[in-house]
UniProtKB/Swiss-Prot annotation:
Membrane-spanning segments: 1386-1406, 1438-1458
Gly residues bias locations: 1484-1493
Organism: Chaetomium globosum (strain ATCC 6205 / CBS 148.51 / DSM 1962 / NBRC 6347 / NRRL 1970) (Soil fungus)
Name of the protein: Vacuolar protein sorting/targeting protein 10
The organism's taxonomic lineage, starting at the top: Eukaryota, Fungi, Dikarya, Ascomycota, Pezizomycotina
Gene3D superfamilies in alphabetical order: 2.10.70.80, 2.120.10.10, 3.30.60.270, YVTN repeat-like/Quinoprotein amine dehydrogenase (2.130.10.10)
Length: 1526
């Protein structure tokens, strides 16, 4: 078999020791040459059309080359010993190869290894991707280099390019990438324009404000991302992947023949969307058939494989079962790659994504597949052993036949059990195939039952050739077949070969009684050579042998015309050629018995074809049709032609598919009979399902459609879980899982897929006693149901199907039993316990990599809990996605003196390292890991933080901020690259009164006070709320009377920040309205402002209190106007649409709200749980609260307990939960009748249904926040349309000039009374030369000025105070520094002359404007306001710790109190709180036992300001008194 580029392995080390050429007599036996190596040869590659071969020794990092097909070997000595890190062959030039090192100097050859030249990349190889080099299909000199630049522990991927084959140093293409590709990445793909084919590049680009893959975008450039001649903007654009709009979440690009595929993902799901183009201009989303007969056709991450496709269609295999014992379905696309039809069900796959599928080389329409015969049993139970059968098709998958040897069926080992390199069965040798298989009903064991079979008629018939499993190869276009027995031992001493298509075989001993364990048998890619390479392992050292085998001496003669035959790919019983894919196909081939060799090295056989007339065999079922009883029957909606039925009525008709189509690639000649038989037929518009047309429009009714479901139960509370779908989800359903319950009893579990229109109890769950419902933290399609025993039931498809596994232990009592990985859906951690007796239990942690099918114990016992902290989102060197952090006892015993330690592992507990001792708790929040350690002597806490989960640094609080006894830390939402840490500063015993919120620097180690006297409750929850969807906006309630007696009631006031805590302000009062006058009017001050009820008064901690992530800037809250917050019973309902700048009262009293259609629908209702009132009506607004209408939903007043909708705010459906005279009910309210069409975005403001809205900053008139102004799409209030689910509200960002707000005080500096950063007395500035060590590519550094740039800012230009000081050269860059700062004669003249000319004017200006601040650096253009004493950087000092520690990934977690907060039933284990950990808090400290019940998590885990929250997953108290009732 040939070594293909796609199957190249990594590099390996080898030291050549000796070689022994052994000649054989002519016409007697082959010639052998052997060479010994110490290490295994890897990445074995032939230069195409040559005898030159090279391999890599991965152990010693060397490359070896042979120019005579392995007879002699030499190390490539142009590369220093031990420096060859990676070997890469050029994909489109047979003379070129590249050896990459770990540094920035690499090596290339353009003459098949005869000479090697150095080239510079300037950047390191990327650690995050294997595809470093990307080649251009037309121009071999055009190459992309995917590398990275690291600053400390923070790494950014960077792409470079060359257009001269690295003859000159590579140039930077773009930063912040996740891989770049040439558009012209295959011979067949073209953009349709020569200049675009040459230059067009596609890059996956990471969002500047978000590390998450769900925010990555595809950007295209035709000038290498440079600026154009007439603009300073970079020339790049984002293509409209989804017809008329771009799509974010791009994760990968693949070029398959003439198609380019882009895969996207989104939050809440691992389902992917595939977008396909034939020219990078017009894109389509790949559409798969409707699910039927248990076939799940969703394309999931790491669950689909692009197979070897044809020039006219794409073939993809999609995994449809559990990963531990996978099966799949193979699909084939239409000619433009858009619509896929099911081709082969129940394909055999393995855990690595390999599929038992292979096309027969050179013969159109013939391929072999392995299917799972007992697929139903395997789908039901993952431990069932597969019964695999082999089949072959000769019509591109329309029909399949058994593989037979004589009259017996045989089954063949295929791609999932690769035992050699290259294709499994076939080669360019026409019609010749070899395989390992067995006779019987299904495929058996390779080693015990496998034999070698040969076919010389393209797989129609097979003959047994040799007993036992063998590695095999083809030579001289099939004139010679070579095989070597496969073995697990070093006991193989001979090879076998055949010169007559496998009818007879000759054995030949290896030289010098050599015995090997074979690893690879290979030859040139064309299979036209008479030379082969055999690689095997031997017992003695050196351990590896590379054996060159030459058969050139067996025949002297070269084949003549009489020795050849015309071989037809398909013949009938009489031997006459038959049509295959619409034509006959024949090849010239050497006759079996001819005693000659073709000796046409490096040439491919050429076929001859002749078209036939079309028959029924040339047609297959069209999209969404499947064959039943010989006919194609509809299994899903019809796809209409472009534009059809867009404005039609359901009964209108059009010409649509008959259900049949000609097989793609079939070349048969059309006939009138076949045309008439399969022509388009009349179809109704009601049958369609998208495509180029559109569903018939439904006129707006301007009415709310409502559907009630009454439950004959005695429930008094609900548990409900919204399964938020992702943007890439193919399903449009809105799924909710719920159950009613009483104080002592759990009700049955109900599921709806249409937002409460219909409910059903899943059969799989009916008989189970389920105590917890736990949605997957990151992938909302997956939900776990924990029973009273060890049985865990789960669904991966939003409740359509169910599976189960056995938990390794009982769940822990005080932590969430399941921990999830943010990128790997099937990676699970089980936090369990083992009990020696009822009162003698200890923690045990287990992990699974296949969704619970198999479990292994993680580390030692007495482990309290573990969680995944690895993530693709945060890129740091050495960071592994397998990283796990655990809290465990230092000793494996119940000893009293047995403190907790924090351990980490990167290899599934094979190795563990203690990171911190005396640990009270740890929390993950965005990229940070925050740990609270305990000082046992004085019983206080110390916080420390890490970015990589390995190196922790103590948190340094601001100079002058002293808390005598630190007992409680609460980690708040930290989604803007800084930790928000609440430190309790006033305690009443162990109960929290109030404290300060401190904000960290970018590595979480040094803090500045953001706001003080913040209210907290007895559980250490804090009145702090980030506003969903906006960067840097948050609300707090502060205690206005901190000096009052402890028995005095707190006087709370509300403050808001619009710049992430740098400045806080009171809320302005609303204007007086029809309801009445307010007691005072003010723009917001301590005596008169609007005050809102906050987080500590919330019953459901996970709920979004004020806002919805997609209704940007819209907030609703309860509160009052005055000097402080009053009782909630006296509060009214207020609303803002400008992110809190202005407010208005919308209802008197406390009304519960829900926001839908991304702010287009707002519903208010009085709920019994809040106001103790019954009702029969609600009010709603369709214009963002400008006007309100009343809707009566019941004839009699009922109790309404809640109103809910999707947390994304994207739905037009709402659900009322309540209780009437007939019992508990749900009432679905459908608002779709108020709109007809999807809102459209248009560059023309008059045509667009949206306008651009930017949040304003109350203290910054330019509206800049973090150096930019954000623009959001908002629907115009007068437009009668609805927001598409896939609308991205954030439309764009515009950078601002740098001002004072973009800089903070540097290390050991603090703000002085003049508002300037001054050195803290007694401290020293940081060593400025450390900058060079952290940034090795920089050539200079500045002396400290006292200022540094805020990491989050994107500002450009303006003042740069961190650089307004003397500059010095970095060590080793002195020459570069001198060149950069060399002064020309003209510049010197002006430098001397101009200061004298300006001295008088400057002196006059200084005299006129002197304000006593001379000698200090002053920033910005705002004047004195910049330095006012009430600015936070004046009031609070800032001290910045040098970045000696950094760390990686922190992920939201659901633990402790959240687990217990939903318990309290059935032994304290009630409905679980799942969700995604957003909007939660992490509390460090408090009671004993590692924090106990008072440790919770609260993290939006947001992406650049998209502050989402958890699902409504906690048990909700209904119909009885609670802390929210007044």
């Amino acid at each position: 078999m040939r070594v293909r580029g796609a199957l190249q392995a990594a590099a390996v080390l080898a030291t050549a020791l000796w070689a022994t050429p052994l000649a054989a007599k002519k016409n007697d036996r082959p010639t052998f040459h052997t060479k010994a190596f110490e290490n295994a040869p890897r990445s074995l590659n032939y230069f195409p059309d040559s005898d030159t071969v090279l391999f890599q020794d991965q152990s010693a990092n060397n490359v070896y080359l042979s120019s005579d097909h392995g007879v002699k070997w030499e190390r490539v000595d142009a590369v220093p010993e031990g420096k060859a890190w990676m070997l890469s062959m050029h994909g489109f030039d047979s003379n070129r190869a590249y050896i990459l090192t770990e540094g920035t100097t690499h090596f290339r050859t353009s003459d098949r290894g005869k000479t090697w030249e150095k080239f510079k990349s300037g950047i390191q190889l990327s650690l995050f991707r294997p595809d470093i080099l990307r080649f251009h299909a037309n121009d071999p000199d055009r190459i992309l280099f995917n590398g990275m630049i690291c600053e400390g522990l923070d790494c950014q991927e960077v792409a470079q390019y060359t257009t001269d084959g690295f003859k000159t140093p590579a140039k930077e293409l773009r930063r912040n990438t996740d891989g770049c590709w040439w558009a012209k990445s295959s011979d067949l793909f073209t953009t349709g324009a020569e200049d675009l084919d040459n230059n067009r590049v596609l890059c996956v680009v990471r969002d500047s404000f978000s590390p998450f893959k769900q925010d990555q975008r595809l950007l295209i450039s035709d000038n290498f991302f440079r600026t154009s001649d007439d603009s300073s903007d970079i020339q790049e654009f984002e293509p409209d992947l989804d017809m008329n709009k771009p799509v974010q979440g791009v994760v990968s690009i693949a070029v398959v023949k003439k198609y380019l595929l882009v895969a996207t993902t989104s939050m809440n799901t691992d389902e992917m969307a595939l977008f396909i183009t034939g020219d990078t201009k017009k894109w389509h989303r790949a559409v798969f058939p409707a699910n039927h007969e248990g076939h799940d056709h969703r394309v999931l991450q790491e669950a689909y494989t692009a197979l070897e496709s044809t020039n006219y269609s794409i073939q993809i295999d999609v995994m449809t079962t559990r990963p531990s014992n996978p099966m799949g379905v193979m699909f084939t696309s239409n000619s433009n790659g858009t619509y896929f039809t099911e081709n082969v069900p129940h394909t055999n796959r393995n855990e690595r994504g390999h599929v038992d599928f292979e096309k027969v080389t050179g013969i159109q329409g013939v391929f072999l597949v392995n299917k799972v015969d007992n697929w139903e049993d395997v789908a039901k139970k993952a431990s069932t052993k597969k019964k695999v059968v082999s089949e072959i098709t000769f019509d591109d998958g329309r029909t399949f036949e058994p593989v037979t040897a004589g009259d017996k069926r045989i089954h063949l080992h295929s791609v999932t059990e690769l035992s050699n390199v290259g294709p499994v069965f076939s080669s360019p040798a026409p019609g010749l195939l070899m395989a390992i298989g067995n006779r019987g009903d299904y495929l058996k064991n390779y080693w015990d039952d496998g034999n070698l079979y040969v076919s010389d008629d393209a797989g129609m018939t097979w003959n047994k050739a040799l007993d036992g499993p063998h590695k095999y190869e083809f030579g001289d276009q099939g004139s010679i077949l070579v095989a070597v027995r496969d073995s697990k031992e070093v006991d193989v001493s001979e090879i076998s070969y055949s010169l007559d298509h496998g009818l007879t075989w000759t054995k030949q001993a290896l030289p010098d009684d050599l015995k090997i364990r074979p690893y690879i048998l290979t030859t040139t890619q064309e299979s036209a050579s008479l030379k082969f390479l055999l690689i095997g392992m031997v017992k003695e050292s050196p351990s590896w042998q590379v054996i060159s085998i030459d058969f050139d001496g067996l025949h002297e003669a070269t084949c003549k015309e009489d020795d050849m035959e015309e071989w037809f790919a398909r013949v009938d019983k009489d031997g006459k050629p038959t049509c295959l894919m619409g034509h006959t196909q024949s090849f010239p081939r050497r006759k079996k018995k001819a005693e000659c060799f073709l000796k046409q090295e490096f040439k491919h056989p050429v076929s001859k074809t002749e078209n036939c007339e079309c028959t029924d065999k040339d047609y297959e079922c069209d999209f969404n049709f499947a064959r039943e009883d010989g006919k194609c029957v509809a299994k899903g909606p019809i796809i209409p032609p472009e534009g059809v039925c867009r404005d039609a009525k359901p009964d209108d008709t059009f010409k649509g598919t008959s259900g049949y189509r000609k097989i793609l690639g079939n070349t048969c000649k059309e006939t009138k009979e076949m045309d008439d038989k399969y022509k388009d037929v009349e179809r109704k518009c009601s049958e369609i399902g998208g495509g180029g047309g559109g569903k018939p429009s439904t006129p707006a009714t301007d009415k709310i459609e409502q559907i009630e479901n009454v439950f004959d139960k005695d429930w008094d509370r609900w548990e409900k879980h919204y399964l938020e779908r992702g943007e890439s989800s193919s399903s449009e359903g809105e799924t909710i899982i719920m159950r009613g319950r009483t104080k002592s009893k759990l009700g049955p579990i109900y599921v709806t897929e249409n937002h409460g229109k219909e409910w059903h109890v899943p059969k799989y769950l009916k008989e189970e006693e389920i105590v917890h419902i736990v949605p997957h933290q990151y992938f909302k399609d997956m939900v776990f149901f924990i029973t009273t025993g060890k049985k865990i039931i789960y669904t991966t498809d939003r409740g359509r199907t169910y599976h189960s596994f056995k938990a390794p232990n009982e769940p822990s009592d005080d932590v969430m039993p399941l921990s999830f990985h943010p990128d790997k859906k099937n990676w699970l951690i089980w936090n369990g316990k083992k009990c020696e007796s009822s009162d003698d239990c200890f923690g045990v942690v287990s992990y699974s990599k296949d969704g619970g099918d198999h479990w292994q114990t993680g580390g030692s016992i007495y482990t309290r809990r573990c969680e995944f902290t690895g993530s693709r989102a945060y890129k740091y060197p050495g960071r592994k996605e397998e990283q796990i952090l655990c809290l465990k006892h230092e000793k494996e015993s119940k000893a009293k003196d047995n403190p907790m330690v924090l351990i980490s592992t990167n290899d599934w507990f094979d190795n563990e390292e203690i990171r911190q001792k005396n640990v009270r708790e740890f929390a993950t929040m965005a990229e940070f890991v925050v740990v609270a350690t305990e000082n046992s002597a004085n019983k206080t806490l110390q916080a420390s933080a890490s970015l990589d989960g390995a190196t922790f640094a103590d948190a340094l609080f601001p100079h002058g901020f002293v808390v005598p006894h630190q007992h409680i830390y609460t980690v708040l939402d930290s989604s803007t690259h800084a930790v928000n840490l609440f430190v309790a500063t006033s305690m009443d015993g162990n109960l929290c009164n109030y404290g300060s919120i401190l904000k960290s620097n970018s590595n979480g180690t040094s803090y500045v006070v953001s706001v003080g006297n913040v209210n907290c409750d007895e559980d250490s929850y804090v009145d702090f709320d980030k506003i969903a969807g906006l960067e840097g906006v948050a609300l707090v309630n502060v205690v206005a009377n901190p000096d009052a007696e402890s028995s005095a009631p707190k006087r709370l006031q509300t403050k808001i920040t619009h710049n992430d805590g740098a400045q806080w302000a009171y809320l302005s009062t609303p204007p007086n309205d029809d309801i009445g006058k307010f007691p005072c009017q003010s723009s917001g001050d301590e005596k008169c402002a609007l005050h809102l009820h906050g987080y500590t008064e919330r019953r459901l901690r996970g709920n979004t209190w004020y806002s919805s992530e997609s209704a940007v800037g819209i907030m609703v809250a309860w509160g009052n106007v005055g000097d402080s917050l009053g009782p909630r019973k006296d509060s009214d309902t207020f609303m803002t649409t400008d992110a809190g700048l202005t407010w208005k009262r919308v209802k008197q009293g406390q009304w519960t709200w829900a926001i839908g259609d991304q702010g287009g629908i707002i519903v208010l209702i009085q709920t019994t749980s809040v106001s103790r009132k019954k009702t029969k009506s609600l009010v709603y607004s369709l214009d963002q609260g400008k006007t309100w209408k009343e809707h009566e939903f019941a004839s009699d007043e009922v109790e309404v307990w809640d109103v809910t909708t999707l947390r994304s705010g994207s739905s037009q459906n709402f659900l009322l939960w309540g209780k009437g005279s007939k019992g508990p009910f749900t009432l679905k309210l459908d608002f779709s009748g108020f709109s007809e069409d999807v809102c459209k975005v248009d560059d023309d403001p008059d045509k667009s249904d949206y306008y651009l809205w930017s949040p304003k900053h109350p203290m910054q008139p330019d509206g800049c926040l973090f150096g930019h102004v954000s623009q959001y799409l908002r629907k115009k209030s007068d437009r009668k349309c609805y927001n598409d689910f896939k609308l991205q509200p954030l439309y764009g960002k515009e950078d601002c000039k740098c001002t004072r707000e973009d800089f903070e005080c540097d290390y050991n500096y603090q703000l002085d009374p003049f508002g300037q950063c001054s050195l803290v007395p007694g401290l020293e500035p940081a060593d400025p030369s450390a900058w060079c060590k952290q940034h090795p590519d920089e050539i200079e550094y500045h002396e400290p000025t006292g200022y540094r740039r805020i990491p989050l800012t994107t500002c450009v230009g303006g003042r740069q105070p961190d650089k307004e000081s003397p500059v010095h050269a970095c060590a080793g860059h002195e020459e570069d520094f001198e060149r950069k700062h060399a002064v020309s004669g003209l510049a010197l003249f002006f430098a001397i002359t101009v200061p004298f000319a300006l001295a008088g004017a400057a002196g006059w200006y200084v005299w006129r404007n002197w304000n006593g601040k001379f000698g200090q650096i002053r920033l910005g253009d705002q004047g004195a306001a910049v330095f006012e004493a009430d600015r936070p950087w004046v009031r609070y000092p800032v001290i910045v710790l040098s970045a000696v520690a950094a760390v990686v990934v922190a992920l939201p977690v659901v633990v402790g109190a959240v687990w217990r907060s939903v318990s309290g039933l059935l032994g304290g284990r009630g409905g679980a709180g799942g969700g995604d950990g957003r909007g939660r808090w992490s509390r460090l400290g408090g009671g004993g036992g590692g924090g106990g019940r008072r440790f919770t998590t609260r993290d939006s885990f947001a992406r650049g300001g998209d502050y989402a929250v958890v699902d409504d997953d906690e048990g909700e108290l209904l119909g009885e008194d609670s802390d929210e009732e007044v």
